[in-house]
Amino acid sequence: MIDQYGADALRFTLATGNAPGNDMRFSDEKVKASRNFANKLWNAARFVLMYLGNDYSYPGLPKDLAIEDKWILSKVNTLAKEVTDNLERFELGIAVAKLYDFIWDVFCDWYIEIAKIRLQSGEGADTAKAVLVYVLTDILKLLHPFMPFITEEIYQAIPHDTESIMISKWPEYDPTLSFADEEAQMEKIMDAIRAIRNRRAEMNIPPSKKSKVYVETAFADVFAVGSEFIKRLAYASDVEIADGFGDLGNTVTIVTNDAKIYIPLGDLVDFEAEAKRLQKELAAAEDKLAFINKKLDNPGFVNKAPEKVVQQNRDEAAKLTEKIANLRSSLENLGK
């Protein structure tokens, strides 16, 4: 097994299934998946090193951090705290799952892709490099107990301040690197990108087919900052942001909690199918709202349930009411 997939992959797999009272079902496929995870980390490190070059000297975190920098720094800061807490409680499986999700999704699939914009244009590249080194270093240290060989190998290749990763300082939570506002703002942008990509995938539209994207939102300043992210990651030729638009003609409409997005795709889209999708989404939202309102109209629930739970239901009802209004408006735009 070690000869085929590597010791790190085997260790990671065994830790993944580690939970008190849990008999792990071992399989080659799980070890193979861990090997693929190690490859993902290795390729991410190679990407970072490619842009650092041979003479790079880590200057420390700069002050001119962009929103995406604050977002990833805040996320890895929280990760360090949570993984440390998990390890102290011997929750190895939970710690490994958090590391896997962060490295694969948050760092590789989001931050690195967004960082490419600055690295390739040159504007803000130095800041992006410094943040990449900082986050990658913390990742390696947190992952080292589970994958000691690959983390040591990468650690030796990037700027480092100790002879071995084994004697380097363990990452600690830093309150100055907690950026809750930037995290919330990035989530709004990422939700929009996910929604656009999902809709394009449903319609089998290839990335090469770019379209202008119109974003109707009350958070224009947030989406203005993220417009370049939308262009790159949601295959937009251009992004226009406003608190309202006139008649845009035939468009595909995408609704998130924070924005209403229009994509004029012309004859690439089956508008009858789009109308059916919106009607289905509207019916589901109306059913969910009716269920929540029934609970809120019940004095027994309102008086006996924890105040926090009642408020969560009220907030959800408000969001659904707004979503329903947006969906109905979208159907009107399609003439349905």
What are these regions (language model features)?
Residues 22-30:
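Short, solvent-exposed helix-loop connector elements
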Residues 29-336:
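Feature 926 captures the class I aminoacyl-tRNA synthetase adenylation module centered on the KMSKS loop
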Residues 1-22:
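Alpha-helical recognition segments enriched in aromatics with Gly/Pro capping
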